Design a protein with these regions (language model features):
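Boundary at the C-terminal end of the N-terminal hydrophobic targeting segment
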Residues: 22-25, 29-34
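N-terminal secretory signal peptides that target proteins for export/translocation
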Residues: 1-8
């Protein structure tokens, strides 16, 4: 089986923002109404805003709430069945687990799609998120979004999560 390279050491590789393209899932068709098995890797977070206050605990809490909400929204949509990934005692993440290993773990767990991403706070008011999903059957990227959101508040994070959940829910996957 060919190895697929998935791109996310985005946090620390800022040029991706310049190269980012907004791929659409236009070529995919949703066949039937069966829920698609989806594994979600915990997103990474990076803050290079240079703000003097240490906001790590606040950001980790907001990221945890974001991850909980996206899992809840996607499972609640009826389009996805969440598949748990096991990476030992720690949650699976792009920073701690090689991408090929994550793909294999997701396949072994029975997932059809693997969703992963990261959020980067680049200034006091601007954050961006790079979020991708791979179809593990076709080995194609079916969701690839780079989005910015203004503010570092609970509302800003909720709006960003709701947008991503809506975009993922609109995704169609061939059976």
């Amino acid at each position: 089986m060919k190895k697929m390279k998935i791109g996310l050491p985005i946090l620390g590789v800022l040029p991706i923002a310049a190269v980012a393209f907004l791929a659409t899932a236009g070529g995919l068709a949703h066949a039937g109404s069966a829920a698609t098995p989806l594994a979600i890797v915990d997103f990474n977070y990076n803050d290079t805003s240079g703000e003097p206050a240490d906001q790590r605990a606040l950001h980790q809490a907001r990221l945890a709430a974001f991850m909980e909400a996206i899992r809840s929204d996607l499972a609640g949509s009826g389009k996805f069945t969440l598949i748990a990934l096991s990476c030992g005692s720690d949650p699976c993440s792009m920073s701690d687990t090689p991408s090929a290993e994550l793909l294999d773990k997701a396949r072994q767990a029975g997932a059809r799609l693997l969703l992963f991403g990261g959020i980067h706070k680049m200034s006091t008011l601007i954050q961006w998120a790079k979020i991708q999903a791979v179809d593990l059957k076709t080995e194609k990227m079916v969701f690839d979004r780079l989005l910015t959101f203004r503010g570092d508040t609970e509302d800003a994070w909720r709006h960003a999560e709701a947008f991503v959940a809506g975009q993922m829910t609109a995704l169609g996957v061939e059976k």
